[in-house]
Amino acid sequence: MKILVTGSLGKISRPLTQILVKAGHQVTVVSSKKEKTTEIEALGANAAIGSVEDVAFLTSAFTGADAVYTMVPPNFAAANLRGYISGIGANYAKAIRATGVKKIVNLSSIGAHLPEGTGPIKGLFDVEHTLNALEGVAVKHLRPGFFYNNFYANVNMIKHMGILGSNYAGRDHLLLVSPADIADAAAEEIQQPFTGKGIRYVVSDERTAGEAASILGAAIGKPELKWEIGRAHV
């Protein structure tokens, strides 16, 4: 199969590319950075350098593909984050219509079924609906949980406050996921036949927030590390 992978060599797209190349597929990786070309080619894939905000570029890149893995690259500098995310989804849809690609595996998120109240994920609600409106195109949305590596954002909190916390309680459950498991799920969906529009949730483990704090604390030599709500968000 000829497969296009968006997301450059990110935490999901890199292992996904490796899986697909190893399986014998002809893979092209989209990246906005020309300096990634050598690294992409070293994986056995082709590089398509350009911006997902450029519909003409996407149309050229999508041409001839049997399947496309779509994701919206983060852009926290966007003045309207939902508008940015929705816009990338619209760009993908235009390129899909123009090129006749028949199979899409799209990275979405848990919570993308809700139109409001989920922060940036609202944009992924829009993307799902935009792609679902494509006629004659099989679309599978992957809805992963909370990425394990998101805990890196709490390093300074642990160092300087001696706690791990957020705006939810230690007894609340977290659906945790490894990017490698998302890549596995994406590769599986790309390589197996499916029709229509569908959703696949991707979760590696389920823990309470308190359990997560205890596990991380034990791993870094801070067995006293606790999950706290409130003080971390005063």
What is the role of each PLM region?
Residues 1-28, 32-39, 53-56, 63, ...:
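Oxidoreductase cofactor-interface core, primarily capturing Rossmann-like NAD(P)-dependent enzymes
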Residues 232-234:
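Conserved small/polar residues in nucleotide/adenosyl-binding loops
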Residues 82-88:
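Glycine-rich anion/phosphate-binding loops
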Residues 50:
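Cofactor-binding loops of NAD(P)H-dependent oxidoreductases
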Residues 44-45, 139:
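Short, conserved active-site loop motifs that form the nucleotide-linked donor/cofactor pocket
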